[in-house]
């Protein structure tokens, strides 16, 4: 099981995954905006077990965004 972490504090702009979805290492999972800069979050290949945030949520650095098996 792998935790997908936020690279920085900011706001979730996009959530591009849902539970049960199979992802690859090139998939853009989330977009986190901080100080008007957008940062794309990628993850390890696997199946999304749970998504813990939604668009508009404020997140902290290293906060768990999703769990992938």
Residue locations for each model-derived region?
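Short beta-strand-turn/beta-hairpin segments enriched in glycine/proline and small hydrophobics
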Residues: 1-11, 28-45
């Amino acid at each position: 099981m792998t935790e997908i972490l936020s690279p920085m504090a900011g706001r979730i702009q996009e959530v591009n995954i849902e539970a049960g979805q199979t992802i690859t290492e090139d998939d853009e999972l989330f977009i986190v905006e901080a100080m008007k800069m957008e940062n794309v979050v990628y993850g390890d290949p696997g199946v999304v077990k749970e998504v813990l945030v939604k668009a508009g949520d404020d997140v902290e650095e290293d906060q768990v965004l999703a769990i992938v098996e």
